[in-house]
């Protein structure tokens, strides 16, 4: 059982209780619903959070991904509705809110959901220029992080990234992914990343924490099948660049010592440390 699965199973009882009280307050705004009905709905929401996860651990399916997506959307909506009901409660302590104001506040959540989903499925390229004296020529790097391939964003996100990288092939020389290529919500199968195989620039990847949840060996195998260069506490030289991939370390996964990292750096090149999280730099 993966770390993510254990974490979700531990949280499900609390999640069900949270759902019950959230739904109870929301329905009270409209006159109320019998508690038995709310208990059943809350339990079903809790089951939807954990049951598809067991199937997705073994083999990702369309049905499993659908329920995981619904769960993810509802979990986000629940947090937004919580903010809504707290705001409504506070305002009602001072004034009596007209019903139409309550309806507007609640309607903001699905509107925001549609807007955020639209933005989350778009790939936007932002540019930043860094200047160094010891570069022979301009090098454009595509930097990505937290792709989170999984049940919610499955092969379509890989296809999107592949198409975007192909668009950038004439202007960019290398792509770097700094962790969480997978999110651990579904098993990564050997050919899941093969959509990136046809990209005509090197793709470098260093694991983040989520990449370990369903088995880092599965993520590495899928990367290798797609021609992705995996840097697991290792370095890769490209033109005037020396890229060192510092793998995310936790539990029994040790962090390389400062001396080990320094020995992998090249004073004659531009050194880039590819690391998932911005801490431990001291």
Identify the meaning behind each predicted range.
Residues 58-61, 123-127, 217, 222:
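A cytosolic-side transmembrane-helix exit/cap motif
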Residues 1-123:
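Non-catalytic terminal accessory segments
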Residues 110-133, 151-156:
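Hydrophobic alpha-helical transmembrane segments in integral membrane proteins
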Residues 131-282:
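Soluble catalytic domains of enzymes that build or remodel membrane lipids, polysaccharides, and related
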Residues 6, 24, 59, 99, ...:
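Context-gated lysine
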């Amino acid at each position: 059982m993966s770390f993510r699965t254990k974490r979700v199973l531990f949280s499900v009882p609390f999640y069900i209780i949270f759902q019950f009280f959230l739904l109870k307050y929301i329905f009270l705004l409209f006159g109320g619903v019998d508690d038995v009905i709310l208990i059943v709905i809350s339990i079903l929401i809790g089951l939807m959070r954990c049951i598809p996860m067991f199937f997705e651990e073994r083999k990702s399916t369309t049905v499993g991904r659908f329920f995981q997506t619904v769960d993810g959307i509802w979990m986000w909506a629940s947090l937004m509705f919580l903010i809504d009901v707290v705001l409504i409660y506070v305002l009602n302590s001072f004034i009596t809110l007209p019903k139409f104001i309550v309806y507007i506040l609640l309607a903001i959540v699905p509107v925001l959901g549609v807007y955020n989903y639209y933005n989350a499925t778009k790939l936007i390229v932002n540019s930043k220029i860094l200047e160094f004296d010891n570069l022979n020529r301009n090098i454009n790097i595509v930097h990505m992080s937290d792709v989170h391939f999984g049940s919610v964003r499955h092969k379509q996100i890989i296809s999107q990234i592949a198409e975007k990288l192909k668009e950038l092939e004439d202007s960019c020389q290398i792509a770097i992914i700094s962790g969480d290529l997978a999110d651990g919500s579904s098993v990564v199968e050997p050919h899941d990343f093969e959509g990136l195989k046809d990209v005509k620039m090197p793709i470098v990847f260093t694991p983040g924490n989520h990449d370990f949840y369903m088995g880092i060996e599965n993520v590495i195998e899928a990367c290798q099948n797609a021609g992705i260069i995996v840097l697991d506490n290792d370095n890769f030289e490209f033109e005037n660049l020396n890229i060192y991939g510092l793998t995310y370390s936790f539990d029994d996964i040790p962090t390389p010592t400062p001396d080990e990292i320094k020995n992998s750096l090249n004073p004659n090149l531009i050194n880039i440390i590819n690391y998932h999280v911005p801490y431990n730099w001291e």
